[in-house]
Amino acid sequence: DYGGNVGASVDPKIAATWRITEELSLRGSASTTFRGPPQSLLAGKGTALSYVGPTASFKAIDTIGNAGLSSEEAFSTNIGLIYQNESFYASIDYWAFTFEDSFQTEGFNQLLGSYSANGCIVDGAATDSVVCNTIGAHIFPVAARSNLASTERIEVNWLNGTEIKTSGVDFKAEYTFSDVMNGAVSVGLDGTYGLEYKRDAGLDYTGSVVLAPAADLMGKLNYNAGPSFTSKPELKLAAHVSYETDAHYGGLVLRHVGEYDDLGAPARLPNLATIEDHTTFDVNYIYRGFDGLTLSASVVNLTDEDPAEARGDLAYDPFTHNAFGRMMKVGFTYTVMGK
């Protein structure tokens, strides 16, 4: 019980497994969850610099707490198959989530976009209307309400957003070859494929102004979908092969992100309309031959791949890709056993 506007919740969960054969099982679950807003969302103000399109520069974004936030709730379901024997494991699961009143903030670029789309500037003067005055109250200084390029600050509020529905499929398979040169070799694959991420129309703090239309964000960059919505590639997977003995472990991991679209890419830059798929390799080695001492070494992004090019001030998508390039790590762990 969080009290106040947040309230309380009883969140049941039901889960069942049917063992069809010794090796094949069917599983499923359904549950509800409840999350009360943290104190940082209920009061106070946080300020950060972000790129504001109409100004072509970074400006101050003030995020205002909302004492009227209610709880965030979700309903989740899952159904899947598992196959397992002494050497092989495989599973596939369908999952779905429905979120209600999720914690979101108004999109600052969406506010400015809506201000323009509603004709709030005519002949260099701000339009006096309910919608324009509601949106304009976010834009500072006041003079910027008649010239968005002169905007210096934008205020956005925490709010309970509209409904979100998302679903997808998780999959995993691994086969182990035992007794290979006094060790074991494992090969495997696991990943997820997103089917949908449907969001109802995004509204402002008052609930009277549409800032973004309803949309399915799966498979999109979502650069202008608001700060609460990041890129959502449909496919992410990792494949591995490893060899392990009592003293040694060596492994190679392939990481792959499928391509996804940027619906807002400018026509003059058609190469940005699709963010290309991206594949990297990691190599890991562990030595456990010393008493109490473990040595390890890794190379991340072995082939030094650059992130896929994308629209934005970083020229890549930081929510999906990494710009660090090849990285090498070494480490050790020494265990002292007490009596």
Task: List the model feature ranges, each with a label.
Residues 14-16, 26-32, 41, 83, ...:
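Transmembrane beta-barrel strands of outer-membrane/channel proteins
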Residues 23-26, 87-90, 181, 185, ...:
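Repeated loop/turn-to-beta-strand initiation elements of outer-membrane beta-barrel proteins
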Residues 36-93, 97-99, 154-169, 174-178, ...:
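Outer-membrane beta-barrel signature, preferentially recognizing the C-terminal barrel domain
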Residues 98-101, 195-198, 254-265, 285-339:
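C-terminal beta-signal and adjacent terminal beta-strands/loops
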Residues 1-5, 33-37, 86-88, 95-101, ...:
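Structural signature of outer-membrane beta-barrel domains
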Residues 98-99, 106-264:
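Gram-negative outer-membrane beta-barrel transporters
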Residues 1-17, 23-72, 74, 89-91, 96-146, 244-257, 261, ...:
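Surface-exposed extracellular loop regions of Gram-negative outer-membrane beta-barrel proteins
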